[in-house]
Amino acid sequence: NKNITTTTINGKVYAKILFVVGLEHNNYKENISNVEKINDIANKYYPGLSRGIYKKEGPGVDGIYNQDISSNSILIELGGVDNNIDEVLNTTEAISNILYYYIKG
């Protein structure tokens, strides 16, 4: 549903983001910590862009997503099937700014 995957911030339409963290590896707490910081930055600069952090584990679920390779590995889902390319491109620009602020500290 487009109203779940879309937001407007300062007149610009974005595909919302969802951070996914797999819990089926030894270092998942570090991944969660990093994603929480990134999510906080997203909420500060782009309120309403993030749908939050989805923690995945359990039978039939890939609870790793290569996040066991590095605590800096993140998975960000953008929008949904109803979003258009302009909304997704607006979001990729926002993500680049969010990651810049995260790396900059």
Where do the PLM segments sit?
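Active-site microenvironments of hydrolase-like enzyme catalytic domains
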Residues: 1-23
